[in-house]
């Protein structure tokens, strides 16, 4: 039941966000059209408003790229760690197998 509720809430919120973003208009075109009141320059609109909106978009895009890069690095480190762990366990398996062979030969 909780899964059903969560997916419905998620769909509702996604729909609401999508609908409200369609009503925003073009970024940097003045108050109420480009993401709300983003300061005096954004509210005034015009070339400076568009420039500020573009700079903000670039800032967030850059931040997103940095986060993705950090996430990729983290996952690669995890993969390397697990590969080393597999190698260590393979050596342990080989060691134990050799002990078993030695015990069989001693019989």
UniProtKB/Swiss-Prot annotation:
Segments for region (Antiparallel alpha-helical coiled coil region): 75-107
Purpose of the protein: Endogenous F(1)F(o)-ATPase inhibitor limiting ATP depletion when the mitochondrial membrane potential falls below a threshold and the F(1)F(o)-ATP synthase starts hydrolyzing ATP to pump protons out of the mitochondrial matrix. Required to avoid the consumption of cellular ATP when the F(1)F(o)-ATP synthase enzyme acts as an ATP hydrolase. Indirectly acts as a regulator of heme synthesis in erythroid tissues: regulates heme synthesis by modulating the mitochondrial pH and redox potential, allowing fech to efficiently catalyze the incorporation of iron into protoporphyrin IX to produce heme.
Q: State the residue spans of region: N-terminal inhibitory region.
A: 24-53
Its subunit composition reads: Homodimer; represents the active form and is present at a pH value below 6.5. Homotetramer; represents the inactive form and is present at a pH value above 7.0.
Coiled-coil annotated spans: 62-107
One molecular function GO term is:
ATPase binding
Q: Which family does it belong to?
A: Belongs to the ATPase inhibitor family.
Question: Which GO BP annotation is one of this protein's?
Answer: protein homotetramerization
Domains as described in the record: Forms an alpha-helical dimer with monomers associated via an antiparallel alpha-helical coiled coil composed of residues 75-107, leaving each N-terminal inhibitory region (residues 27-56) accessible for interaction with an F1 catalytic domain. The inhibitory N-terminal region (residues 27-56) binds the alpha(ADP-bound)-beta(ADP-bound) (ATP5F1A-ATP5F1B) interface of F1-ATPase, and also contact the central gamma subunit (ATP5F1C).
Q: What InterPro entries does the entry give?
A: ATPase_inhibitor_mt
- The source's domain of life comes to Eukaryota
Biased composition regions of type Gly residues, renumbered to the chain: 27-40
Q: Which UniProt keywords apply?
A: Coiled coil, Mitochondrion, Transit peptide
Q: What is this protein called?
A: ATPase inhibitor B, mitochondrial
Q: Is Secreted given among the entry's keywords? A: no
A Pfam family (short name) is IATP
In this chain, the stretch annotated as Disordered covers: 24-48
Compartment list: Mitochondrion
GO terms for cellular component: cytoplasm; mitochondrion
